[in-house]
Amino acid sequence: MDLPLAVPVAPMLAKAAKVVPAQPEDGPAVWSYEPKWDGFRAIVFRDGDEVVLGSRGGKDLARYFPELVEAIKAELPEKIVVDGEIVVPREKNGSTRLDWESLSERIHPAASRVTMLAEKTPAQFIGFDLLAVGDEDLTAEPFSTRRARLLDAVGTGGPSCFVTSATDDAAVAEDWFERFEGAGLDGVVAKKLDGIYLPNKREMVKIKHARTADCVLIGYRIHKSGNGIGSLLLGLYDGDDLRMIGGASAFTDKRRLELLEELEPLRLGDDVTYDGEATRWNSSNDRNWIPVRIERVIEVAYDQMEGARLRHVARFLRWRPDRDPRSCAYDQLEVPVRYDVADVIAGGR
C-alpha cells in the first residue's frame, strides 16, 4: 500500500469517566461528543483495490467481512485511512439495533461460514476519525480539522459506511447517553477538539452505562493457566428455570486460588459441557465448566444485556449471603427503551 501511514496503526484509546465532561462556562467549546458504538474497533486502510481492516491488536479482519471490503471500495475515497467501528445491526421487534452476538459470530475460520454470514448478517462501518486521505497524513491536525475533513471526504455515508454523529452540546450528549442505549450502543465518547491523534494513548474520555445485579452462582471454569478459577458462571431465574446469563472474571492470581479453595465444598462432581450455542463467554473451544450447589449469590457490575444474556463479561463485586438464590430473577434488570440504529446515525433527530 502506498499511503501516508503504514499498516498497522494502533488506535487512540479512551479513559473511563462517570459523567460527560462539561464545556467551559466562558469561551469556545473544547469537547466534541459522539455516541459510543459497541462493535469491533477497526482502522480502515484503502489504497485502490487494496483494503485492510486493522483491529485494535493489529490483525487484519478483512477476511471475516468480505461484504464490508466491497462496500469500502464502493463508498470510500481511493486512498484513505479512517478510524471507526465495525457493527452488525439487526431488526428485532420492529426496531433495528446493534447485535453483538451476530458480530461475534463473524470471526470464524471457515470461509464458507464467513460467506454465509456476510449475506445473512451484513456488517457496517461507522467512521469517527480521519487519519489520512490522499497523500496527506492528518494525525498531527486537531480533531476539529480531522472531523471536518472526514465529512468532506465521506459525507454522511451509506449504505454500508457512515460517519458517526457528533455534537459540542453536553446536554445533547447526555440525552444520547440515555436514548441510544436502546439501539445497543455503549455510552458516549468525548474528544478534545484541539487534540491530535496519538496512537495507543488514552486521550479520549468514555462514559459507559454501569449497573449492578444479584446473580446466582451456578458454576465456574478453571483458568486457562490451569491454576485457580478463571471465571464464575452466573444465572438468573426465569420463573422456575435457572438460566445461565454470562460470567464474571478478571481475578488476580491470588484471588483465583482463593476462590477455588472457597468453592471446592460446593462442587457437584466432574466438569460438564454446556449444551447450548457457543457465545462470547462460552466459546466453541471451551465449553466445559464445573457446576456447584445452588447456594451462593453474587453481586456483579455489568453494562448491558443482549437479549437474556450479559453483553460483556461482568465484574465481581461481592458475595450476597443475605440473598436467597430463588430471589434472583430477571425482573431486577433495567430494560432500556428500544431505539433504532438509523436514528442514531442521523444524530437522534
Where are these regions (language model features)?
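Catalytic cores of nucleic-acid ligases and guanylyltransferases
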Residues: 1-349
